[in-house]
Amino acid sequence: MADNKSENTLSSDATEVRAQKLKLLREQIGEVYPAHFHRTMTNAELIAKYENLEPDVETQDVVTVAGRVYSSRNSGMFMDIHDARGKIQIFSHKDTTPEEARALLPMIDIGDIIGVTGSVRRTKRGELTINAQTITMLTKSLLPMPEKWHGLSDIELRYRKRHLDIMTNEDSKLRFQQRSKILSGIRRFMENDGFMEVETPMLQSVYGGATAEPFKTHHNTLKLDMYLRIAPELFLKRTLISGLTDKVFEVNRNFRNEGVSTRHNPEFTMMECYWAYADYEDIMDLVERLFESLALSIHGTTEFPFGDKTMSFKGPFKRVPMPDAVKEATGIDFRAIKTDEEARVAAKAAGFAVEKDWTWGECLAFIFEEKVESTLIQPSHVTHFPKDISPFAKEVPGEPRLVERFETYCNAWELGNAFSELNDPEEQRRRMVEQLEQAHARGEKEKQLDEEFLDAIDQGMPPAGGLGIGVDRLIMLLTNAPSIRDVILFPARRSKAD
């Protein structure tokens, strides 16, 4: 195997040393990157099986495990190897380990992936250990690992080289395991509640369902400009119209060609659903049940930490109409204000810089964002939105300037947006045409009317409640993550050259 002469001729540069060891290994053992290795159990399974093994007890049980080497002590006599779910100590000694296996030890570096067969014991100090009988090189790592206990200190590098971040940061690793569990939990909850999951187009010839700047591309064969979807709403409503199901949902990515922040990524995950014969109050109940279920699955309780706060996903959540919240915060009674001009005057008198063409509803929503949003720390539903900014929602009976819409807030973040969906085809067309004219006035000349959707709604859409949940923000809360980039495996970032 590796003689002293080979060791003594190795370079002092860490990367070069690994390359030289790889060359020696190829010469001495042949295949250094085998296609297959059979484990008898994972590290986690091993730990669970022998959790009651007493200290200083050695079994005759022989197991085979594999993992990445995270630490090596006493010239490889003690090594810790990790797989995705656990750590096991490997012990190699002349009394228990054949010479052929021990001869491989000088060639093993931190970061290499090895397979080990041996007997199970627990040391006097209580460490579950395998006495190595055979050691197999499975992957020779050509680059040193970052320092295990501190991980990557450069935040941008953590996002650029997420594989190293997860490799060296147990918090990051756990967070993405929890993300997977949350996504599964959303799907399981929705299916158990009778919803059918569908997939709607990511590439759309007409974008809609939200107000946002899309990413544009071109289909060469069809000779057609297309857009990455900004929302699945109109296709999900067409599915509801079809009668395929009365309860439909989708969990998938949306794309918006807009800014990047701690709460915004241009590619993000949404859960959107539509429930026939329900209204926005039914959807509020659904949100509360879903959030409580997810908190219990991750934390075992509805209360959990976020930063220096304790959040509670135990329903019912606080419910407050937007005009009432603004009146309480500022003293401005928007229900008593009759015209757009009066709304602008009242807003300016209270010190708010509003635009000269803003409507009553735009003034109300702006003041809410400025004065109320930041106070919504515990989960809250804000209801009764202005119709001006809610083109797809039904009017509140007796209050035609307001609609049956709510947004769910927590930690001052918007987590969800829901409506009693507009299903009057004539009113829907009028509002969509008005929205299109506003978009064109803003310079969004590519925005088009979705005639296929309007044709479908002419066929008749049942009354329904609709909901969109920002899954990434919800995961941020449930995993105590300060930035959306901490919960997206490979977030958007500037190129390395920038």
Curated annotation (Swiss-Prot):
Its cofactor is Mg(2+). Belongs to the class-II aminoacyl-tRNA synthetase family. It comes from the Bacteria. It is an enzyme of class 6 (ligase). One of its GO terms (biological process) is lysyl-tRNA aminoacylation. This is Lysine--tRNA ligase. Mg(2+) 1 binds at E407, E414. One of its GO terms (cellular component) is cytosol. It is found in: Cytoplasm. Binds 3 Mg(2+) ions per subunit. HAMAP family: Lys_tRNA_synth_class2. GO terms for molecular function: ATP binding; lysine-tRNA ligase activity; magnesium ion binding; tRNA binding. Pfam families: tRNA-synt_2, tRNA_anti-codon. It catalyses: tRNA(Lys) + L-lysine + ATP = L-lysyl-tRNA(Lys) + AMP + diphosphate. The keyword Cytoplasm applies. Its EC number is 6.1.1.6. Keywords: Aminoacyl-tRNA synthetase, ATP-binding, Cytoplasm, Ligase, Magnesium, Metal-binding, Nucleotide-binding, Protein biosynthesis. The keyword DNA-binding does not apply. Mg(2+) 2 binds at E414. Homodimer.
